[in-house]
Amino acid sequence: METRTPRDPNTLSNYHNYVTRHTSLDFEIEFERKRLVGSVVLRMESLTDAEVDVVLDSSFLDVSAIKVDRQSAEFSIGERIEPYGSPLTIKLPAAVPKGKTVEIELTVATTEKCTALQWMEPAQTSNKKHPYMFSQCQANHARSVFPCQDTPDVKSTFSFALRSPLPVLASGLPTGASKYQPAKKDGASGTLKYTFEQPVAITSYLMAVASGDLACASIGPRSTVWSGPEELLECQQELEGEIEPFMKAIESIVKPTYQWTQYNVLILPPSFPYGGMENPVWTYATPSIISGDKQNIDVIAHELSHSWSGNLVSAASWEHFWLNEGWTTYLERRIQGVLHGESHRHFSAIIGWKALEESIERYGADHDFTKLVIDLKGKDPDDAFSSIPYEKGFHALYQFELLLGKDKWDNFIPHYFETFKFKSIDSYDFKACLIDFFAKDTEANKKLAEFDWDKLFYAPGYPPKPDFDQTMVKSCYKLADKWQYLITNNSSSDFKPHHSDVADWVSNQSVVFLEKVQSFAEKFSAEQIHLLGHTYGYDKTQNIEVLSRYLSAGLMAKAPETYQPSAELLGRIGRMKFVRPMYRLLEKADRKLAVETFEKNKDFYHPICRSMVEKDLFGDEKK
């Protein structure tokens, strides 16, 4: 019997025997019962001649019936295996010949334990009129929405039919809204069936759905923005004219051209746990990027880059997550270089290095999760989520740019994406592709032959730190040095802080300045923290990137005037980038307030964020 060796340790499915080629989802979105209910049809191809069982991933699902080629089939749901859910085993009437397909229809409903869906009451939305729901399936949460081969090593095309009383978005191209049904009871709304097609094969974690009181506006020739009606104008003003230059910039670096037809942005409610999620056709984005000054929209450059790295060429397992995020961070910074100049690219990398330092220090420099390629057997991929695959992954690629020279490296980039488009790969595929591409280039071939690949993939801790262009950070560090001298030599310092110190800066320069300040923040008095925030307007800023870092410095300094504003910020944003570090700092400053703040806001957070913060605050005792 021939089998493929499964590369993904975080799936219970037997995807090496059967592989999904097309997924059809037909669900009703029931806001009242907070569930999706309907059916899923999987068209699966046999990779062997002998296997009679199909095993799918499932997690907290209510599966009531299964048909195989329209005939009722026996199935069983195994014991739950944390953190992967329960294997769903379907008995086929007979083994399917290799290369032939079988159609499996499952009648299914989600349950209250679903980890991918967040359901929001009207009170949790901006206009407080209608409920709202959205999904977040990365890393392995699609299995809590529908039984599937929940592994990035499998890609299928998708069809969506989603019935809802409110507008729906899904990770495909919209094909219409029809089949109106009147309300089933007084006071309820009638429903429409919204349909979408995704002709490009995608991984299960890119399955996305959102429904709520949504409106849209154009922001470019290939792009629209969607948000709540009240925020729409503000979102449009922030993003209008910004997307197409990003797209033109990246299309000058990679190949093939943009494959997904439209690039739209959904600005989610503030509880969304990530900066963005690269769902095809619709990037999901945090409202924290809408700062009124167009200073935080680099998140869009990042998610757009995922249209190539992650979505078109996908890491085959979460152990090789750097292939998604390292490439994407690299491409995001290349976009910045094209649009704003190389000094901006280097400036972003300097900010990234600080994030890398924080993650490595938190884990410890010899921790397995600080490696580029990690071992996730028996582990939860969410536990390994940090800036390391982003930033250490970026440095892996930047290392090759420096090693081979930018011109040669730039010839490889489009070749890589053309070679692996529509496929899932691991780090060894990347290595083989790079070596093969330069096989006839004597100089490059010699450098790659001498390169320490084992160190790149498996060494924990820091990558080599390159020399960055310091142009944009010099003034940030200089001002931080003045503050440090003021703090330690108050009487002899002639430095008088003034708003003009930062008047000419872009907001990310304030970010770098505040991150430098954090390195000695515990030496600040409460009065000096007040002076810092008041003088530079950091205590009143609408820019969450800046505000969160100022408040973090205040928490490090144990300055009580920053405690309540920190708690308030934690009650209005669910992005884990801000929430998790701030809870850790607030706990050290005032554990009682940290716990009270979490208990007050835990239902506001997405289940993934809530689970992570619980681990941060309580360890595993809450399980």
Curated annotation (Swiss-Prot):
Q: Which CDD domains match?
A: M1_LTA4H
Which BP terms does GO give this entry?
cytoplasm to vacuole targeting by the NVT pathway; lipid metabolic process; peptide catabolic process; protein catabolic process; proteolysis
Query: According to the lineage, what is the superkingdom?
Result: Eukaryota
Q: Can the keyword Phosphoprotein be found in this entry's annotation?
A: no
Q: Which residues bind a peptide?
A: Q136, C137, Q138, P273, Y274, G275, G276, M277, E278
Record has Endoplasmic reticulum as a keyword: no
Free-text cofactor note: Binds 1 zinc ion per subunit.
Q: Which residues form the active site?
A: E303 (proton acceptor), Y390 (proton donor)
User: What UniProt keywords apply to this chain's record, in alphabetical order?
Assistant: Cytoplasm, Hydrolase, Metal-binding, Metalloprotease, Nucleus, Protease, Zinc
Q: What is its main location?
A: cytoplasm
**Region forming the signal peptide:** none
Cofactor dependency: Zn(2+)
Q: Which reaction does this enzyme catalyse, per its entry?
A: an epoxide + H2O = an ethanediol
The residues listed in the UniProt record as binding Zn(2+), with positions renumbered to this chain, are H302, H306, E325
What InterPro entries does the entry give? Aminopeptidase_N-like_N (IPR045357), Aminopeptidase_N-like_N_sf (IPR042097), ARM-type_fold (IPR016024), LTA4H_cat (IPR049980), M1_LTA-4_hydro/amino_C_sf (IPR038502), M1_LTA4H (IPR034015), Peptidase_M1 (IPR001930), Peptidase_M1_C (IPR015211)
Which residue ranges traverse the bilayer? none
Q: Where in the cell is it found?
A: Cytoplasm; Nucleus
E.C. number, please?
Answer: 3.4.11.-, 3.3.2.10
In alphabetical order, the GO MF annotations are: aminopeptidase activity; epoxide hydrolase activity; metallopeptidase activity; zinc ion binding
| Any single GO CC term annotated in Swiss-Prot or TrEMBL for this entry | NVT complex
- Pfam families, A to Z: Leuk-A4-hydro_C, Peptidase_M1, Peptidase_M1_N
> Which family would the database say this protein is a member of?
Belongs to the peptidase M1 family.
Q: Which PANTHER family match?
A: LEUKOTRIENE A-4 HYDROLASE
What does the record give as the function of this protein?
Answer: Aminopeptidase that preferentially cleaves di- and tripeptides. Also has low epoxide hydrolase activity (in vitro). Can hydrolyze the epoxide leukotriene LTA(4) but it forms preferentially 5,6-dihydroxy-7,9,11,14-eicosatetraenoic acid rather than the cytokine leukotriene B(4) as the product compared to the homologous mammalian enzyme (in vitro).
What is the protein name stated in its UniProt record? Leucine aminopeptidase 2
- Give the species: Phaeosphaeria nodorum (strain SN15 / ATCC MYA-4574 / FGSC 10173)
